Amino acid sequence: MGVIPCAIIGLLLDNIIEDYLSKNIVIAITLILYGMIFIFVEKHPKKEKIQTIERLDYKSALKIGCFQCLALIPGTSRSGATILGGLYCGCSRTVASEFSFFLAIPVMFGATLLKVIKYLMKVGLFSFGQLFLLVLGTFVAFVVSLFAIKALLNYVKNHDFTVFGWYRIILGIFVILFFYIL
């Protein structure tokens, strides 16, 4: 259920998003905005009603999927948007994070498949070397992501997301400085 909204919106608006929103200023603003939202959410927490992923119902999953659509805007973290959606729906940090990573699998696969199809239609078939690098890169990214997910899930059991909020704000300011001031 959580994947459906993003799949529909992503397919319908892919070119528009790529043409109009893939700007450094949009990325900087969304980095800062979501950083502020993370800090706000941590300072004003909702009551945690959902303590285990098994208690997550279809309605909440669909709502979290709608939050995932926000990640179509460049600079928005897909996992950040879905974690915020989970917290909004009353999930614990751990459940929100776990569900966010479950949602990533079909969305990342679908987005990658769409980009590969666009590439094939525009350029043609991959060379053997390109195909090898694509498969190797995918495998390495998958293995590294498993370690990163495990580390993040361990982190959120004992910490909040405030540090991620500040990280996003600082990175957004750096993007503005780098591309518009320096």
Question: Residue spans of the language-model regions?
Answer:
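Multi-pass membrane proteins that catalyze or facilitate reactions on polyprenyl-/lipid-phosphate substrates
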Residues: 1-182
